[in-house]
C-alpha cells in the first residue's frame, strides 16, 4: 500500500475516525490491527518474518529482565547479604554471562533474518566471481521495511541489555512498536524509550495537533508528488544511459537527483510524522535542513538523523572503546607514533561504521564504496581541522561573512552530489567514469541547446513546476532555519494559515504526478 495511493488515503481516513471514536484504552490495539492490515497488503510472508522478530525480541528482553530482577532480589536477600565480596562478584558475573548469552542469541536471530534475506544473493554473486563458481541465486523477496524495523527492535534489545529501558511484558505492545506502519517505509528508526510514552497512551482529539498533522501530511505530498515524482523521469533517463549523457548531463543529473531524493525522502518523513501527530504520537525529526550544512560532518548530523544516531550509539561508540581496539591503539602509540595511536580507534570505528552504513543501504558494492568515501572525507576533514582553525582565526572577518557561508554550503552540497553518483548509476566503474566526464567532457551548450533537456521525459512546463516547487521548498527551509516551525508562525494568523494550506492543496491536486495512467513511484528508501 503506497503512501501515494488512493487506498492509503482511504485507509488513513477510516483509521483517524475510528481512532477517536472507540474507547481510548483500545486505541493502541486499533493501531496494531491497522499495522497488520497495512503490512498484509505487502504480502503475508513478510508478516511471518516480522512476527519472528517480535517473538525473539520480546522473549529475549523479558528473559534478560527476569534474570536482572532475580539477581537484584537475591543480593538484597539475607542469603545474598551473607555472601563474601568475592562470592557476590562471582554471582553477579555468572548472571551477567547468562544475560549476555541471551542478548547475543537475540541479536544473531534478529540480524540473521535481515542478513539472510538481504545479503545472500550479494554473497553468492561475490563467491561466484572470486572462485568462478556457479551457485544459483535465491529467489527471496525482501519484506517491506525489514531494515528499518530490524534496527528498531535491535535498538530495543540493546537498550534493555544496557538497562536503559525496562522490558515490555506485553508482547502485543512489542509488536506495535515493531510494526507501527508510518515508520515502516523509511523510518525514522525510533527508540522504544522515545516512542512508548505516546504510542501506548490514551489520546483525546486535539484540534491543533490534528490540524498540524494534516498540514504536515499535505506538505509531504507536495514534495513527493509535485517535485520528486516529476523529476524522476529526467533522473531515470540521464542515469539510464551513461554513455550518451556525459559531462554537463552528469552534473545536471546529480543536482536533479539531489533535489528528487531530498523531496522524496523528506516528503515521506513529513507524511510519517504527520500521520503520527494526528494520532497523538510523537516521532522525532529525521531531517534538519541538511543542504544548509557547511561541512560533511554537519550534513550527517542533519540528514537521516535516526540512522546516523543508531550507528553512532550502537556501532561507533561501543567499537571505539572495545578492549581489543584500545589495546591495538596502545600498541600503535608505542610502535608507530603517539598521535597515530590516539587516532587509530576513531579511524577504525569510523571506517567500520560507514562500511556498515553503506551495506545497510543496499547489498551492492556501489553502496559500500559510497559509505567508505563518506568515511574518507569525514576523516580527511578531521585531519585538516587544525589548518582550518588557523585559517579561521587569521581570517575571522572573511569566514564570518555571508559569502563564505554560501561557499562552504555549496562545497558541501556539490561533494554530496558527487558521492550520490554511486547511487544514481548503481555501478562503481560506471559511476566514476561518468563523474570523470564532468572534468573531461563538460559542455553546457550541448545540454542547453536544441531542446536537449526536453528529450528526457519532461516538458518545459514540468521543469518550471519543479523549479517553482524547489524554490518554495527552499523558502520554507529558510524560514524554518531562522524561526523554527512554519506552522506555529502561521497558527497565530488563522486566515493566512488556511489560505496557505488551501493553495498548497490546490497545488498538489493540480500539479501532482498522480491519477489514472500514472505509475506511482515507490519512495526511494523503500528499497532499503
Annotate the PLM regions.
Residues 1-527:
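Membrane-embedded transmembrane alpha-helical bundles that form the catalytic cores
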Amino acid at each position: 500500500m503506497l503512501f501515494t495511493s488512493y487506498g492509503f488515503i482511504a485507509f488513513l481516513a477510516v483509521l483517524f475516525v475510528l481512532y477517536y471514536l472507540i474507547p481510548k484504552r483500545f486505541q493502541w490495539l486499533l493501531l496494531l490491527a491497522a499495522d497488520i492490515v497495512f503490512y498484509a497488503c505487502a504480502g503475508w510472508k513478510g508478516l511471518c518474518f516480522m512476527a519472528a522478530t517480535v517473538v525473539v525480541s520480546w522473549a529475549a528482553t523479558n528473559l534478560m529482565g527476569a534474570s536482572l530482577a532475580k539477581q537484584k532480589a537475591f543480593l538484597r536477600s539475607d542469603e545474598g547479604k551473607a555472601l563474601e565480596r568475592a562470592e557476590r562478584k562471582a554471582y553477579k558475573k555468572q548472571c551477567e554471562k547468562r544475560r549476555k548469552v541471551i542478548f547475543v542469541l537475540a541479536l544473531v536471530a534478529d540480524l540473521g533474518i535481515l542478513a539472510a534475506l538481504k545479503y545472500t544473493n550479494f554473497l553468492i554473486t561475490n563467491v561466484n566471481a572470486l572462485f568462478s563458481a556457479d551457485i544459483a541465486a535465491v529467489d527471496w523477496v525482501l519484506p517491506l521495511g525489514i531494515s528499518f524495523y530490524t534496527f528498531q527492535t535491535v535498538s530495543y534489545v540493546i537498550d534493555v541489555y544496557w538497562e536503559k529501558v525496562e522490558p515490555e511484558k506485553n508482547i502485543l505492545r512489542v509488536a506495535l512498536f515493531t510494526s507501527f506502519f508510518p515508520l515502516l517505509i523509511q523510518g525514522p528508526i525510533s527508540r522504544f524509550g522515545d516512542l512508548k510514552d505516546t504510542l501506548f497512551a490514551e489520546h483525546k482529539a486535539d484540534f491543533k495537533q490534528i490540524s498540524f498533522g494534516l498540514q504536515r501530511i499535505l506538505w509531504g505530498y507536495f514534495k513527493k508528488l509535485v517535485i520528486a515524482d516529476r523529476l524522476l523521469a529526467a533522473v531515470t533517463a540521464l542515469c539510464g544511459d551513461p554513455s550518451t549523457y556525459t559531462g554537463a548531463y552528469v552534473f545536471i543529473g546529480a543536482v536533479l537527483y539531489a533535489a528528487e531524493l531530498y523531496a522524496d525522502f523528506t516528503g515521506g518523513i513529513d507524511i510519517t510524522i504527520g500521520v503520527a501527530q494526528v494520532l497523538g504520537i510523537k516521532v522525532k525529526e529525521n531531517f534538519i535542513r541538511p543542504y544548509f550544512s557547511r561541512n560533511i560532518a554537519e550534513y550527517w548530523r542533519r540528514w537521516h538523523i535516526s540512522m546516523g544516531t543508531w550507528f553512532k550509539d550502537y556501532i561507533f561508540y561501543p567499537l571505539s572503546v572495545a578492549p581489543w581496539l584500545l589495546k591495538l591503539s596502545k600498541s600503535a602509540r608505542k610502535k608507530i607514533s603517539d598521535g597515530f595511536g590516539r587516532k587509530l580507534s576513531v579511524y577504525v570505528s569510523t571506517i567500520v561504521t560507514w562500511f556498515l552504513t553503506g551495506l545497510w543501504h543496499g547489498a551492492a558494492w556501489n553502496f559500500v564504496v559510497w559509505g567508505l568515501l563518506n568515511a574518507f572525507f569525514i576523516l580527511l576533514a578531521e585531519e585538516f581541522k587544525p589548518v582550518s582553525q588557523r585559517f579561521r582565526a587569521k581570517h575571522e572577518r572573511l569566514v564570518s561573512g555571508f559569502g563564505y557561508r554560501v561557499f562552504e554550503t555549496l562545497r558541501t552540497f556539490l561533494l554530496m552530489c558527487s558521492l550520490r553518483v554511486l547511487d544514481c548509476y548503481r555501478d562503481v566503474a560506471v559511476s566514476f567514469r561518468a563523474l570523470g566526464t564532468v572534468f573531461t567532457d563538460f559542455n553546457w551548450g550541448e545540454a542547453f541547446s536544441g531542446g536537449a533537456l526536453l528529450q528526457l521525459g519532461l516538458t518545459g512546463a514540468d521543469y518550471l513546476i519543479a523549479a517553482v516547487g524547489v524554490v518554495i521548498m527552499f523558502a520554507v527551509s529558510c524560514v524554518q532555519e531562522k524561526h523554527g516551525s512554519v506552522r506555529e508562525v502561521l497558527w497565530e494568523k488563522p486566515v493566512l494559515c488556511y489560505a496557505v494550506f488551501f493553495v498548497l492543496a490546490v497545488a498538489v491536486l493540480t500539479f501532482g504526478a498522480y491519477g489514472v495512467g500514472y505509475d506511482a513511484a515507490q519512495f526511494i528508501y523503500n528499497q532499503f
